[in-house]
Amino acid sequence: MDLYVYDSGKEVSTLNAILSKNEMKKMDVIFGPMHQKQIKPLSDFAKKNDIRLVIPFSQKGEEVFNNPAVYQINTPQSYLYSEVYEHFTRQFPNAHVIFIEPISADKEKAEFISGLKQELKNKGISMQTVNENATKETLKAALRNDKENIFIPTSGKNVLLIKVLPQLTLLVRDNAGQNIHLFGYPEWQTYTRDHLESFFELDVYFYSSFYTNTLFPAAVQFTNAYHKWYSKDLSSKYPNYAMLGFDTGFFFLKGLSRYGSELENNLSKMNLTPIQTGFKFQRVNNWGGFINKKVFFIRFTKNFELVKLDFE
């Protein structure tokens, strides 16, 4: 395997200098770039020379819709919603959903909540709404004895979690026989340290296209290897870029070693276990590339177990 690594900087001129090198036209796959303004010229180059282009960072850009060789790893959230809805109704077929609305509406989750309500309606799943100031008694009145009660805030912000967690915790403690969960969003993993005990007590779920935990064996092994190679610790950003790079590189290099030019016809057979970021590629249209529609559910059980649910 021949591996070429370049610093493309921030400017298109720097990228063009790299693309002018003779070896660039012979690549099997190119990973990058980091900066948005470099994506189109790199996509044009990859398309002209029939080279796979894996875009790991940006959620923006139209290149994936008109270049069949583009793979977009970091998919816009709206493209994942249908996957979340399908996984949700499969995980909770006997659900009663109780939406918790903030006093000031959060437009960021409006599309997700609207789509989820329509999916619940289509599946005949009952639902109702309370506001963020609901007391324990109000929350109890919303419960169904014959259902799995799922509370879903209509905002992903930490300020709403801080507001509702105390009342939900009291509710769960006073109604131990009831089946109650709290369901939320990818950004909740950044609040986990603040609310860890509550997450376990409330049997919390949230969805995400990436997740890892320092207790997972694969993550421990990777972290130790990273420290050995680079004599520094991993950053605490979400997602972790080092793990993103490893998962992405491993997927495509393994795929090319297995299937070569037939990789695109065998993507569904690539059942690798990632450290952080999973892959489920779907072609966007007949003339476009692939977006990553992989979604996990992360569960904090009452037995203090952390479970990463994979639905494929």
Give residue spans per PLM region.
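Extracytosolic ligand-binding ectodomains
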Residues: 1-312
